Amino acid sequence: MLKFRNFFKLTLLTLASAFFLSGCANINLISAVGSSSVQPLLNKLSSYYVLNENNDNDKLVEISVQAGGSNAGIRAIINGFADIGNVSKNPKEYAKENEKKWRDKKLKTLTIGKDAIAVIYKAPQELKGKLLLTKDNINDLYDLFAGVKTINIDKFVKKDTKNMSNEKDYPLTSFPRTGGSFASGTAEAFLNFSALKSDKTLDSQTRDILKGIINYGPLAKPTSETNIEAFNTFVTNLQDPNLFGMIYLSLGFIQNNLQAIKNNGFEILPIKYENKEVLPSNQTVSQNEYKWVRPLNSIVSLSEENKNIDEIKTFFNWLFFNGKKDVIKNIYDEFGILQLTEDEKKKMFKTNDSSPMNLENFWVDDFAFSNPIFGAF
């Protein structure tokens, strides 16, 4: 019921905005709803575009970007409550579940950027900088965030420093996103995209909890969807010097708030891929060394019934192909989000040709592809 209420509020807000702007001559409202990870980036990009690039007096636009979660974004675009559905996950499962609507509305998934998931932690002083995530303890991390089993910090201590924590157990508290991967693109990326393959099967109860099928256990403290609210909950609940815990956040948020993270005594959890320890950064992500990466998607309808389709295409053409590259890059850098490579862009073209001269093969719906991948990856 709570999820429906939130979605209903977002719908009313979008409709109210449309009603208000309908009285303004020559202004078309483009409404975007969904992922709280996509929202700040798209809001800044669209604001710059509206103020500096939208010069056609006959087709002036206002782009309203609201958060609410990836699930809300998908439902909004499928049901026609928004022009753009923002989703920080691959929407393939939703597309298959709603294939008729997806086809009828000619929905296209646009990957506008990529972000990484990273874990920060609070540890006792003697263990700061001594934790490591590997394929051998990734399931322990998932059990921790499910909140049913007590998971002590020694599960994540590097083997060569384990003797430092033998005298005392330090149980961890986890701070997952409310609703699990069903509601949150951040939670889905946390569960599915680590690229660490454990030799052991993940506990079925843990998986169902993290998917949002059943509620978190009593040892977890679920947070709101946005990074800032989740982080503030983490800070508030770990004020006691004897309490320790972990939370997953967007890498973009971590990089932009690194000083606050350090000031609170928190550390970033490195990952061991094969034989190399890697800390998350734009550089390690772009070099494919840090692999816990997710897409940031905007889904649009290419249906002839979409009265704003021309303005929507013009905006995204500006973003992908025609805009000032330095300006756009600076906006991405501000949020710690990576732009797509040319090879990644090609995946959104039906003919694998990302030339701006080939846009008729870019603006085709997801199911027009012989093997739909729904965005760039």
Curated annotation (Swiss-Prot):
Keyword annotations from UniProtKB, A to Z: Cell membrane, Lipoprotein, Membrane, Palmitate, Signal
This protein's record includes keyword Ribosomal protein: no
Signal sequence range: 1-23
A cellular component term, taken from the record's GO annotations: plasma membrane
Listed SUPFAM superfamilies: Periplasmic binding protein-like II (SSF53850)
Protein topology in the membrane: Lipid-anchor
Subcellular location: Cell membrane
Pfam family, one: PBP_like_2
Protein name per Swiss-Prot or TrEMBL: Uncharacterized lipoprotein MG412
Source organism: Mycoplasma genitalium (strain ATCC 33530 / DSM 19775 / NCTC 10195 / G37)
